[in-house]
Amino acid sequence: MVLAAARVLLLTLAALGASGQGQMPLGGDLGPQMLRELQETNAALQDVRDLLRQQVKEITFLKNTVMECDACGMQPARTPKLTVRPLSQCSPGFCFPGVACTETANGARCGPCPEGFTGNGSHCADVNECTAHPCFPRVRCINTSPGFRCEACPPGFSGPTHEGVGLAFAKANKQVCTDINECETGQHNCVPNSVCVNTVGSFQCGPCQPGFVGDQASGCRRRPQRFCPDGTPSPCHEKADCVLERDGSRSCVCAVGWAGNGLICGRDTDLDGFPDEKLRCSERQCRKDNCVTVPNSGQEDVDQDGIGDACDPDADGDGVLNEKDNCPLVRNPDQRNTDGDKWGDACDNCRSQKNDDQKDTDKDGRGDACDDDIDGDRIRNPVDNCPKVPNSDQKDTDGDGVGDACDNCPQKSNADQRDVDHDFVGDACDSDQDQDGDGHQDSKDNCPTVPNSAQQDSDHDGQGDACDDDDDNDGVPDSRDNCRLVPNPGQEDMDRDGVGDACQGDFDADKVVDKIDVCPENAEVTLTDFRAFQTVVLDPEGDAQIDPNWVVLNQGMEIVQTMNSDPGLAVGYTAFNGVDFEGTFHVNTATDDDYAGFIFGYQDSSSFYVVMWKQMEQTYWQANPFRAVAEPGIQLKAVKSSTGPGEQLRNALWHTGDTASQVRLLWKDPRNVGWKDKTSYRWFLQHRPQVGYIRVRFYEGPELVADSNVILDTTMRGGRLGVFCFSQENIIWANLRYRCNDTIPEDYEAQRLLQA
């Protein structure tokens, strides 16, 4: 470009010289030709200048480019050296499709066959994964190449499509088909308002639901809301149930969460049987609750200030708060305490001798610690062979120094009275042979082959009523006797109602009318009463915590446990066959989050059922003998311990789940919800040991919050009732009620068929 511009300039100058013979005119008069040549020269110079500017830019760009290449290490392009490779040994098709081919010194080599095939890599055959049975039972498996495929889940089941490749996958991954609950999804043909029972892969239709009448053929119609079960008009409050009594009369009972006389019901927040506000009726249960939010079914109020002891910070009104008062229920502002135990002189039954337990066996006002005749049988303790059981005759058949009245082996000498399983039968004579499973060993069972935990023997002939065809021994067989438990050979029946005059209104002749008798067919049991109870410590040798402290109120119908303790039971002495057991459960503190509950079917300290409720998930702090993890929620367990009370049973009770040779988990509330602080719950238990029927329900206020539904288990065929605690303080069990009941519930049969 520069050379070209210079060439143009030289040509122009030459032209100028040629035209003027080398001379420029001296005047200002330029000829036209000269002017034209100057203009052309000027234009040429302008072009040269532009070309020079462009050339400078290009040179600068080339310079910068070269410098940048030097900075990044780039070298001038070189022609690559040509190499000659030998011909590849891995020719197409040498290996099975999808198999890698590798050249080696010894020639080409094929890799393994793909998943779902077997062979040497060059030749691969399909694997039949169906031989591993990856599909759900009754589902067809289809082998593909490669892999397998399962057909859809069978009718009554649902699940995702299932397919895969390879034997390893087929063995490790089975088709999952989940039972369809047709009763929940509506995929059933049961008539509306009837019971639908889900079965594996199908369903069954049952009777009409409560509150409805009819059947599957005619349909289920709502029972008139204000009628009694016998069809007569109901006089009850809208929040009360009409109940038919044994004699055919009707009673009204307020529903859960309500209290009153049944004709009138009001809200009952704490579920203790007393309404929050006074009702317009005169019965005791119509009075206003003196502790609206704390259950106190006895309504105790020692200072008569209208505030119940259970919620009164100064129950005795002496100016000293309960938590510091050494006599919280007896007025003593001076707090005098001569013997220095936990109790002030005003309420201490042994003022000059320490006795924190305040036990008073004969209820004479003098504690056992300072009473020279503990049982009140007029025989002084040092010479009394049963110092805690009245026995003025001092009979001692086996001569072991322990009177028959308190001897756990009266026919066999055993002065130590050892009884490791707490069943009142000493180890010296305890055979543990109980073929009918009712908790009474065969040698002491009045019906050894028929479960009868209550051991009722109305005519005292040594043969239990359960296996005696003439219970009252009046010569009339039970099947024809209009008073089965009361002798009446004449069978008088003035009103011809089928019930003999001798037992009319009081079937067991215990002088408690059937309407209020909790066991109208057992003269030995009349009212709910836990005032006499057996204490069972389930970890007696452990050092984790202290033992429970039980306080009984309301004439034996309320129990309070005050301590953060080891696992323990308070067990009543009455044994039951079939029973209904209900009560109100309340933790009256915001401290701790552990177990509380109740027991039934108690036969000994190794054999019982327990319903227990944990508030929060927690691992037990004693890792020996094994790690135990408690989950929140309600649990129903069958305890059958091979070791009995101790660390093994302790950790097994804490653990949610089965523990071999200790505990089986029969049911757990699927909600996994713990109990709430200072909240009342009402439970209802039905136990029919003759068929293994168990069902437990929990209410929070009027709302049903948990239902085990029907559980069938015959581990314990009857036993005693009680309450349970484990590491939880300030538990209240209020408004306790039990009732003998051998009637089989209607929902038993459907469950039996389901489990058959």
Curated annotation (Swiss-Prot):
Per the UniProt entry, the glycosylated residues are 120, 741
Give the GO cellular component terms, alphabetically: collagen-containing extracellular matrix; extracellular region; extracellular space; protein-containing complex
UniProt-annotated stretches for the region COMP N-terminal: 22-85
Q: Which domain of life is it from?
A: Eukaryota
State the PROSITE patterns in the record: EGF_2, EGF_3, EGF_CA, TSP3, TSP_CTER
**Placement of sequence motif Cell attachment site:** 366-368
**Protein name, please?**
Cartilage oligomeric matrix protein
Organism, by scientific name, is: Bos taurus
**Underlying gene:** COMP
